[in-house]
């Protein structure tokens, strides 16, 4: 059994008397990526800021390596990549890394060896003298990750680290993150990107400051009490409202030239097909495999209602 590294229990947070987080419960193990998935304002960043001691909870407990998250002794065991990366634009790539190495008390020789290794792993070798403010988004991301890893943390908190970077940089970033996970580091990863959520070991779906569902991506798909079908035909969007009123239909979302329809399990595919023909004879329906994006969208819409 892997060690528990991050533990949140009945965690609440409020700002200026406004409740932001409600009864957050989650556990992250060594060598695991836990994805906090939700839209802007759902509470992802607040959880990370609580985890690194920038904010204090109103109620509940948040433990990192069995210590209170606000305990300063944790400073050298954790790494935090905030939105915007938190780099120093007037310092060079080398100077940024040296600053963070010094911040965590690495001896000069050890820091030099580690920085050289991370420059190579992140593809920044040859850019040591370039100012942080002159880097592209993808290179800033690589530098931020290198700075976060320079002291070999046991825990990482990443706040939407791939926002605004190109697909190739995102892929390279995830290759590095997979290596970090393999080294046994526990990672709490905030994202609104469903493709990234699929790569996490487990995810927690956040809505309005609450975790409304959590588990592996496969479990979240399997836990649904409805099933997904795809409806196609000419002018499909024209029939959306009528289809939503059919027996057994829970939700209907237009996706391109088709309609994704969630059906209650009590509604058979054949009975829905017959009802559909009453709407328009040219409409066809077939089973569809739900993705994490599909079930997340369903959960969020149902929660809002």
Predicted regions and their residues:
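Conserved ABC ATPase signature
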Residues: 131-135
């Amino acid at each position: 059994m892997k060690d528990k590294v991050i533990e949140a229990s009945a965690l609440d947070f409020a700002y200026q008397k406004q409740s932001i987080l409600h009864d957050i419960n989650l556990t992250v193990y060594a060598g695991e990526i836990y994805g906090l998935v939700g839209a802007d304002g759902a509470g992802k960043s607040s959880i990370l800021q609580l985890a690194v001691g920038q904010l204090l909870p109103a109620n509940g407990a948040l433990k990192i390596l069995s210590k209170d998250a606000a305990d300063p002794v944790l400073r050298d065991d954790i790494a935090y990549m905030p939105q915007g990366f938190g780099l120093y634009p007037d310092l060079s790539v080398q100077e940024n890394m040296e600053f963070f190495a010094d911040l965590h008390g690495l001896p000069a020789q050890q820091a030099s060896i580690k920085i050289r290794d991370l420059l190579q792993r992140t593809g920044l070798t040859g850019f040591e003298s370039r100012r942080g403010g002159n880097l592209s988004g993808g290179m800033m991301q690589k530098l931020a990750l290198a700075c976060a890893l320079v002291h070999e943390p046991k825990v990482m908190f990443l706040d939407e680290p791939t926002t605004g970077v190109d697909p190739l940089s995102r892929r390279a970033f995830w290759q590095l993150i997979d290596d970090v996970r393999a080294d046994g580091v526990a990672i709490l990863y905030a994202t609104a990107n469903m493709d990234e959520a699929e790569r996490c070991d487990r995810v927690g779906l956040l809505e309005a400051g609450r975790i409304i569902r959590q588990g592996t991506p496969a479990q979240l798909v399997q836990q649904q009490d409805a099933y997904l079908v795809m409806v196609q035909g000419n002018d499909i969007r024209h029939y959306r409202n009528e289809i939503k009123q059919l027996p057994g239909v829970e939700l209907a979302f237009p996706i391109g030239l088709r309609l994704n329809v969630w059906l209650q399990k009590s509604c058979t595919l054949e009975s829905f097909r017959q009802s559909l023909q009453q709407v328009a004879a040219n409409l066809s329906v077939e089973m569809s495999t739900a993705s994490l994006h599909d079930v997340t969208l369903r959960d969020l819409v149902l929660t809002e209602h």
